[in-house]
Design a protein with these regions (language model features):
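Beta-strand-rich N-terminal accessory domains
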Residues: 36-82, 86, 112-122
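Acidic, contiguous internal or C-terminal segments within carbohydrate-active enzymes
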Residues: 51-52, 56-62, 162-215
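Active-site loop/turn microenvironments that scaffold catalytic and metal-binding pockets
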Residues: 78-140, 222
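Polysaccharide-binding surfaces and accessory modules of carbohydrate-active proteins
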Residues: 78-79, 85-89, 208-230
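Conserved small/polar residues in nucleotide/adenosyl-binding loops
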Residues: 231-237
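C-terminal motif of bacterial Sec signal peptides marking the signal peptidase cleavage site
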Residues: 16-17
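Extended, loop-rich substrate-binding clefts of extracytoplasmic carbohydrate-active enzymes
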Residues: 26-30, 34-44, 51-53, 121, ...
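Sec-dependent N-terminal signal peptides
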Residues: 5-13
Length: 237
């Protein structure tokens, strides 16, 4: 009987050891990269970590080109995660959302899911109250990008979208490059090439909470957009 208790105790200790990852294997935000490793539509997903010399950290998964966490120092130097995200790829798959995603082919709404191109009317999926939102129900936020970690601060993601993807015309090769600068800025650059006239409108869909605590409200956050042009949309756009 004592032997059985001893074996059970050893098994419990081994299980506990497996469930408690050493801090060195976790990201600064506490993410376990192993929980982002799976296969979606025959493509491998993973978590990529960017770090600069100042200690800032950005975690990105190639599933949807999503920013998962941004650890940045507050005014007192305390590191805080300022974006909303999930702790595993399973959560992103099982709870569909746009958290942190690279949106495409077309961000925002296309009225009634229709647009005219060279005199032809293109009908898209209507996935949002009769309109096409964020490229349709199978938009790029649910695709697996090919990832290339260029250096510790730069990640390039590439996605090939075939002609007719969600009924958009043209074969499109899209690239999203994330660059973490040494002055704690995130530079996101988008580019796309196509073999046929089409429409493209890419963006990032991160949700920020500068309190660094998702249980606190963000209603007192102030955002400044350094833009030369402003587009105002309505419920149908």
């Amino acid at each position: 009987m004592k032997k059985h208790f001893l074996l059970a105790g050893i098994a419990a200790l081994m299980l506990a050891a497996c469930n408690n990852k050493p801090a060195s294997e976790l990201t600064l935000s506490g993410l376990d990269p192993a929980k982002f490793q799976t296969e979606v539509n025959n493509a491998q997903t993973a978590l990529y970590t960017l770090k600069n010399k100042a200690g800032m950290e950005v975690c990105i998964t190639n599933f949807g080109g999503r920013i998962v966490s941004i650890m940045v120092p507050d005014k007192n130097g305390k590191m805080q995660d300022v974006v909303l995200g999930f702790d595993s790829i399973a959560d992103y798959i099982n709870v569909p959302s746009d958290f942190g995603a690279s949106i495409g082919r077309y961000a925002n709404r296309i009225n009634q899911g229709r647009f005219v191109l060279d005199g032809d009317t293109i009908q898209l999926p209507q996935n949002n109250f009769g309109h096409c939102l964020h490229g349709g129900p199978k938009g790029w936020q649910y695709k697996v990008y090919e990832a290339n970690l260029i250096d510790p601060t730069t990640l390039e993601l590439t996605l090939v979208s075939p002609d007719g993807d969600e009924n958009f015309p043209g074969n499109v090769t899209a690239k999203v490059t994330y660059k973490l600068t040494e002055d704690n800025a995130i530079d996101i650059k988008y580019s796309a090439t196509t073999d046929k006239k089409t429409i493209i409108n890419m963006t990032n869909h991160s949700y920020f909470n500068l309190a660094g605590d998702p249980s606190k409200t963000s209603t007192d956050n102030i955002m400044y957009v350094n833009a030369c042009l402003l587009y105002t949309s309505d419920a149908a756009d």
